[in-house]
Amino acid sequence: MKNTILILFTAFIALLGFFGMSAEALADPKADPLAGPNPDADPEAINLKAIAALARNY
């Protein structure tokens, strides 16, 4: 049972990679693919912007 779930999960991830879907595209499917990252859908982008703002202040 555990092996079956692992195989299905791996196949699902492989299909996502095959069709070029990234984690951000899954998080914000209505986003324009040519636009920059959406900070509302990508919490990592918010952290990078905050770190960059702190670095500029020092």
From Swiss-Prot:
GO terms for biological process: defense response to bacterium; defense response to fungus; innate immune response; killing of cells of another organism. Expressed by the venom gland. AXPX repeats lie at residues 27-30, 31-34, 35-38, 41-44. Residues 28-45 form a propeptide. Residues 1-27 form the signal peptide. Its main location: secreted. It is found in: Secreted. Keywords: Antibiotic, Antimicrobial, Fungicide, Immunity, Innate immunity, Repeat, Secreted, Signal. It comes from the Eukaryota. The keyword Nucleotidyltransferase does not apply. One of its GO terms (cellular component) is extracellular region. Belongs to the MCD family. Mastoparan subfamily. The synthetic peptide shows antimicrobial activities against Gram-negative bacteria (but not against all strains tested), Gram-positive bacteria (all strains tested) and the fungi C.albicans (but not C.parapsilosis). Exhibits little hemolytic activity against washed human erythrocytes. This is Mastoparan-VT7. It comes from Vespa tropica.
